[in-house]
């Protein structure tokens, strides 16, 4: 059976974690305190009970610092928390006379709201900030909202949002920087037809720069069309724009992803010849390209090139080398690189473990047992994986009949204050119900809803079938009531973007 957090344990979590007599500074922020606050917020049964009284009781306003607020919001974002909870916490922080809000905290709150399609609340927050804290409005906050509107809305709605920001929120005449943000919104969603249309329609007004052209070039590259990328590059040059190192980096990445590693290396040589700055990021891209080309010797040569050029390899460079070795089937070599990385004092991150998991899954030598070993190492480091890794591990555990490991992963995520992705819940529910463990599946679904996230229709139907056969329909009715309450606070299917 899946164990609930006991009432005593939860009360310990709710014990005041911050002393009202001392303020948290950037040097004294404690990871455990951040985690405990995240668990309190994420685990609170909102909207059934208001969250502000809990915040007031357990987080004294006098103890809040801008860094602490930003760290908590960052954890709530990573934890896929309900947007309204994040908004309530941000608003609570505004009550502190000692802690002025920061752009970072505002942007994180806005991002959490927009990601969950709470557009009414996002616009209201923008308007409130415009009125009370206008200095918090930034290019980044504009980009966050426009990108999500471009994702969930239409071409026309995105343009209307751009005009609304100019006239009602920022209240100034927009220039090329804002124009670039609008283009990036469409390019991020790989809507290159729309991005090109915007460019042709408005470029005479905004006088585009090389950054404008690089944004469009990146859009074509991300759309996976290397031919269109190169055609636009030549158009860019024809229009009189001078390519820079960013331009070359985009083109190199495009060729690497399309397995045209030779062309990527030719561009790299051109960069050297033209005396462009060679960055760790450029070399990291080429290391990834070596892996795609299944050339582990070149991957190592390029990695060593970083130090030869007086640069310092970062976690991303090590991850690229490990990933390339994994693609070439050299799992043992990747393990050695990970040890080398740790010896240099560079901490492995979620991408490191994701690469290790993928490599071991494909390896006959390490296989499932190797994944389990590194899963435990990840937990020992208190490292929380990103959503793709969670879903991948859940699928692996459940499909290999190790449903208890799936439950262990679920419990670990909740203990860290995270609400696992809906697809992870579907995988776990399917495996549990297939093994006649409907009560455990119900508990996972209840925990999801309690944290302000809805369960999918397939999950509910599986529970309905399994619990009906066990004569436990009362549980199902309770869950249905909670879902209906939650739906009243979630954005409707037909959302208002403006």
UniProtKB/Swiss-Prot annotation:
The keyword Repeat applies. One of its GO terms (cellular component) is mitochondrion. Belongs to the PPR family. P subfamily. The keyword Repeat applies. Gene3D superfamilies: Tetratricopeptide repeat domain (1.25.40.10). Keywords: Repeat. It holds the Pfam family PPR. GO terms for biological process: mRNA splicing, via spliceosome. Transmembrane segments: none annotated. This is Pentatricopeptide repeat-containing protein At3g61360. PPR repeats lie at residues 102-132, 138-172, 175-205, 209-243, 244-278, 279-313, 314-348, 349-385, 386-420.
């Amino acid at each position: 059976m899946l164990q609930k957090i006991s009432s005593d344990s939860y009360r310990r979590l709710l014990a005041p974690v911050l002393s009202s007599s001392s303020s948290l500074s950037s040097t004294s922020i404690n990871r455990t305190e951040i985690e405990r606050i995240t668990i309190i917020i994420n685990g609170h049964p909102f909207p059934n009970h208001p969250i502000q009284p809990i915040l007031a009781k357990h987080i004294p306003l006098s103890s809040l610092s801008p860094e602490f607020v930003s760290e908590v919001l960052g954890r709530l974002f990573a934890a896929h928390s309900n947007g309204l909870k994040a908004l309530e916490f941000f608003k609570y922080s505004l009550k502190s006379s000692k802690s002025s809000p920061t752009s970072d905290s505002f942007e994180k709150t806005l991002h959490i709201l927009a990601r969950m399609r709470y557009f009414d609340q996002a616009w209201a927050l923008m308007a409130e900030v415009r009125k009370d804290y206008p200095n918090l409005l930034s290019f980044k906050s504009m980009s966050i909202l426009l990108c999500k509107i471009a994702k969930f809305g239409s071409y026309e709605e995105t343009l209307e949002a751009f005009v609304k920001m100019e006239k009602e929120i920022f209240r100034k005449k927009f220039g090329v920087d804002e124009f670039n943000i609008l283009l990036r919104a469409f390019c991020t969603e790989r809507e290159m037809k729309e991005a090109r249309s915007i460019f042709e329609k408005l470029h005479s007004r905004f006088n585009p720069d090389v950054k404008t052209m690089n944004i469009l070039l990146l859009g074509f590259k991300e759309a996976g069309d290397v031919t269109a990328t190169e055609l636009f590059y030549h158009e860019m040059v024809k229009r009189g724009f001078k390519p820079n190192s960013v331009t070359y980096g985009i083109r190199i990445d495009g060729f690497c992803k399309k397995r045209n590693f030779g062309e990527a290396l030719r561009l790299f040589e051109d960069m050297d010849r033209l005396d462009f700055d060679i960055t760790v990021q450029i070399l990291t891209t080429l290391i990834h390209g070596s892996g795609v080309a299944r050339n582990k010797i070149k991957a190592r040569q390029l990695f060593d090139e970083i130090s030869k050029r007086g640069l310092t390899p970062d976690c991303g460079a090590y991850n690229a080398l490990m990933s390339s070795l994994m693609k070439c089937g050299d799992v043992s070599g990747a393990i050695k690189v990970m040890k080398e990385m740790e010896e240099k004092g560079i901490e492995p991150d979620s991408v490191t473990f994701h690469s290790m998991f993928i490599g071991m899954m494909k390896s006959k030598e390490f296989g499932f047992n190797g994944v389990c070993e590194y899963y435990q190492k990840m937990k020992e480091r208190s490292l929380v994986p990103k959503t793709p890794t969670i879903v991948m591990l859940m699928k692996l555990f459940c499909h290999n009949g190790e449903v208890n490991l799936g439950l262990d992963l679920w419990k670990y995520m909740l203990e860290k204050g995270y609400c696992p992705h809906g697809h992870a819940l579907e995988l776990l529910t399917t495996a549990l119900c297939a093994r006649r463990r409907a009560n455990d599946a119900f508990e996972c679904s209840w925990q999801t809803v309690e944290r302000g996230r809805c369960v999918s229709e397939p999950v509910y139907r599986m529970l309905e079938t399994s619990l009906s056969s066990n004569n436990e329909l009362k549980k199902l009715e309770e869950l249905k009531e909670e879902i209906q309450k939650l739906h009243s606070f979630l954005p409707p299917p037909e959302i208002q973007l403006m």
